[in-house]
From Swiss-Prot:
Pathway: Isoprenoid biosynthesis; isopentenyl diphosphate biosynthesis via DXP pathway; isopentenyl diphosphate from 1-deoxy-D-xylulose 5-phosphate: step 3/6
Top-rank taxon: Bacteria
Role of this protein: Catalyzes the phosphorylation of the position 2 hydroxy group of 4-diphosphocytidyl-2C-methyl-D-erythritol.
Native source organism of the sequence: Thermodesulfovibrio yellowstonii (strain ATCC 51303 / DSM 11347 / YP87)
Classification via InterPro entries: GHMP_kinase_C_dom (IPR013750), GHMP_kinase_C_sf (IPR036554), GHMP_kinase_N_dom (IPR006204), IspE (IPR004424), Ribosomal_Su5_D2-typ_SF (IPR020568), Ribsml_uS5_D2-typ_fold_subgr (IPR014721)
MF (Gene Ontology): 4-(cytidine 5'-diphospho)-2-C-methyl-D-erythritol kinase activity; ATP binding
Family affiliation: Belongs to the GHMP kinase family. IspE subfamily.
Membrane-spanning parts: none
PANTHER family in alphabetical order: 4-DIPHOSPHOCYTIDYL-2-C-METHYL-D-ERYTHRITOL KINASE, CHLOROPLASTIC
HAMAP family: IspE (MF_00061)
Nucleotide-binding found in the keyword field: yes
UniProt protein name: 4-diphosphocytidyl-2-C-methyl-D-erythritol kinase
Catalytic activity: 4-CDP-2-C-methyl-D-erythritol + ATP = 4-CDP-2-C-methyl-D-erythritol 2-phosphate + ADP + H(+)
Length: 285
């Protein structure tokens, strides 16, 4: 039996460069894991079973897709029982399903004694979902391509965030489709790449008083969901240094000086799903 944590993520920045011939988009993003996590328990079994409170079909669960993808790649027909205890909300832009899938691949690689390397697990994960490869290289990475090109970085300073999620979710597919219709995508790769590295350097050094966060998906999301903009503004009023939509949403995070300040801000968001979290640093615990 194995018990594993599947950590959530936030995007400090996302630039969408272009739509690809395969229907995906080329992006460049700075992503970091946070200490909010799901818990997965893996037990040897004759067949695939997933025990969870999620009200979705087993076949649509990324954990199930990860198991099947690993079986197909290796030819192994072993089963597994997975007990999935969710803390990361669905449709939140926090990568919960993707993290669960990556955690499943890593756990079964150990449980089934497959001895696959990270590169192989990365490739299997990328065939299931675009965000999955990041979760093999925590805690912080620059992610490019459709999410399958990952550059791991180092960081030793942890930051306090307040996560606020309204009572609706946002479809990633919708967010990108709407972006295509309403936004002229930039192709200034060198400029964007430099901005991403500047942002990383600010985070690495702890100089976050005058740094800039951005998310190309925000514009179309804010037009359809004005409540997101309201949350962003309220986070600033509550003392956050900055606030941003994570991924395609619907979670917004605010960056605070410390945990005390973030907890004080909770009173502004009664009725919302909220969590005070820390960004993860090396070594992971």
């Amino acid at each position: 039996m194995l018990t594993c944590k599947a950590f959530a993520k936030i995007n400090w920045a996302i630039s969408v460069l272009k739509k690809r011939d395969d229907g995906y988009h080329d992006i460049i993003s700075l992503m970091q894991a946070i200490d909010l996590h799901d818990t997965l328990i893996f037990k040897s079994s004759q067949k695939i079973e997933i025990e969870t409170d999620l009200l979705i079909k087993k076949e649509n669960n990324l954990v199930y897709k990860a198991i099947k993808a690993l079986q197909n790649y290796t030819g192994i027909k072993k089963g597994v029982t997975v007990i999935l205890k969710k803390e990361i909300p669905l449709g939140a832009g926090l990568g919960g399903g993707s993290s669960d899938a990556a955690t499943t691949l890593k756990a079964l690689n150990e449980l089934w004694q497959l001895n696959l390397d990270i590169k192989t697990l990365h490739e299997i994960g990328a065939s299931i979902g675009s965000d999955i490869p990041f979760f093999f290289y925590l805690p912080i990475c620059i992610v490019e391509g459709r999410g399958d090109v990952v550059k791991p970085l180092k960081i030793s300073k942890s930051y306090t965030l307040l996560l606020v999620k309204p009572d609706f979710s946002i479809s990633t597919e919708w967010a990108y489709k709407t972006l295509d219709l309403k936004t002229e995508l930039t192709t200034e790769y060198e400029k964007i790449n430099n901005n991403i590295w500047q942002l990383y350097n600010h985070l690495y050094s702890g100089d976050v008083d005058n740094f800039y966060l951005w998310n190309d998906l925000e514009k179309s999301v804010l037009e359809k969901y004005p409540e997101i903009d309201k949350i962003k503004r309220k986070l600033i009023e509550a003392g956050a240094k900055s606030s941003l939509l994570s991924g395609s949403g619907s979670t917004v995070f605010g960056l605070f000086n410390n945990k005390t300040d973030a907890q004080k801000a909770l009173k502004f968001f009664e009725g919302y799903w909220c969590r005070v979290v820390q960004t993860l640093v090396e070594p992971l615990k």
